[in-house]
Amino acid sequence: MSHSVKIYDTCIGCTQCVRACPLDVLEMVPWDGCKAAQIASSPRTEDCVGCKRCETACPTDFLSIRVYLGAETTRSMGLAY
């Protein structure tokens, strides 16, 4: 099952999440919106197993990256009973 990985604008380009991911789901891409001139991107979300190591590694208090597991995605969309 793939999971939704969202990168938010609080990314500081530190690469901690990329290094923490055991499946190389994340990568850094050029971006002019931060001092590091790069931001995390998730081009391979279908490979995400939902371990949330990227969230744990993120120094911006879990605000840069969110991994939504299948049940969480359903709840957040108001589809759960």
UniProtKB/Swiss-Prot annotation:
Reaction equation(s) it catalyzes: reduced [plastocyanin] + hnu + oxidized [2Fe-2S]-[ferredoxin] = oxidized [plastocyanin] + reduced [2Fe-2S]-[ferredoxin]
Cofactor binding summary note: Binds 2 [4Fe-4S] clusters. Cluster 2 is most probably the spectroscopically characterized electron acceptor FA and cluster 1 is most probably FB.
EC number: 1.97.1.12
Impact after mutating C51D: No detectable PsaC, D or E
Superkingdom of source: Bacteria
Residues of the 4Fe-4S ferredoxin-type domain: 2-31, 39-68
MF term (GO), any: metal ion binding
Mutagenesis or variant effect for C14D: No detectable PsaC, D or E
Subunit structure: The cyanobacterial PSI reaction center is composed of one copy each of PsaA,B,C,D,E,F,I,J,K,L,M and X, and forms trimeric complexes.
Cross-referenced NCBIfam families: PS_I_psaC
Name of this chain's protein: Photosystem I iron-sulfur center
Organism this protein belongs to: Synechocystis sp. (strain ATCC 27184 / PCC 6803 / Kazusa)
